[in-house]
Amino acid sequence: MKTNVELISTRVYAGRLKDRENLNNSSSGGAFTALSDFFLKNGNAVVAAIYNYENHTTEFQMILDKDQRERAKGSKYMQSKPGCIFREAYRWLMEHSGKKMLFVGMGCQSDGFRKFSEMKGIRDRVYIVDIICHGSPSPKLWREYAESVQKKDGKITFLTFKDKRNGWKSPTAYVKANGEEKSIKDYVKVFYNRCALRPSCYECPYATTERRTDMTIGDFWHIEETIPDFYDSNGNSLFLIHTNRGEELFEKIQSDLDYRLSNTTQCWQANLEAPTKKSEQREEFWNDYKKKGIDFVMKKYGSVPMKTKIKNKLLKIMGGGVHRR
């Protein structure tokens, strides 16, 4: 079905929230907060993933107020369940004539919603944003990990993968169980080791700067090297604008941002060029997981070897770089 959405040559911006409190409470530069604020304050809807503390899954939900939106903020290193959200989104738009919707998800999820919206004739009423993605581990892996943490430490009531207490470039990942912080850096290390991702993630067709969503957002990594005079230690977001609608949307949120025009050379990062490479340990990891369970693989693949710990300590004493993962 014909729409008014037109692809344009991708435009690139670096940006972050002007509001320092909101910036500090965002996992990056506050791109999602700026975008969702614009929709919610005008009585429109947002669709995004929210963590469910009862069953330890991440699920897409319809968001209609800022309190609910707060639960959708932050990085989630697991696959989100779409459930019936496409039908719910369509029904909401049919029941709210003249209203608009923001959909935010990974590349595969957002492109799926784009195709659905075109098929249903609602593409002109939705703005579709995807997030730069490293890949998604199996939901079962995180669920078993969370259940293991709860058995040892008590009920999980809070989760963050990117707390910025040590700055944006050195995020802290932890859960709160019985009110106490519990590090989950072993899970994060497994995530970045590339051995636990879904098979399709290693062949992701969305790992490119040219996409068919309206906008792509993510961390503007290496900005301290490519645009040093714009770098902020509290977070920097990357905006890739792909359509005329994305351009229009970015103009609407500019008043909430400090921003700078950039280019695809300055913003280069691996997952804007190619999918994450499969780890040589992947088959071994899953065999160990099936035979020996979650605690074993987290200890084997999620811990830092003693030799590396000693090296890092020496580097720190000498003022050198620190191996973070």
Map each language-model feature to its residues.
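Iron-sulfur-cluster electron-transfer modules
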Residues: 1-105, 252-325
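Long, compositionally biased charged/polar accessory segments in the mid-to-C-terminal portions
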Residues: 42-45, 154-325
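Hydrophobic/aromatic beta-strand patches that form the interior of the parallel beta-sheet core
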Residues: 47, 127-129, 215
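Short beta-strand segments
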Residues: 48-50, 104-105, 130-132, 160-162
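A short acidic (Asp/Glu
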Residues: 58-60, 112-116, 138-143
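Short, surface-exposed basic-aromatic patches at helix termini and helix-loop junctions that form
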Residues: 95, 114-126, 146-151
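Short, flexible loop segments at boundaries between secondary-structure elements
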Residues: 124-148
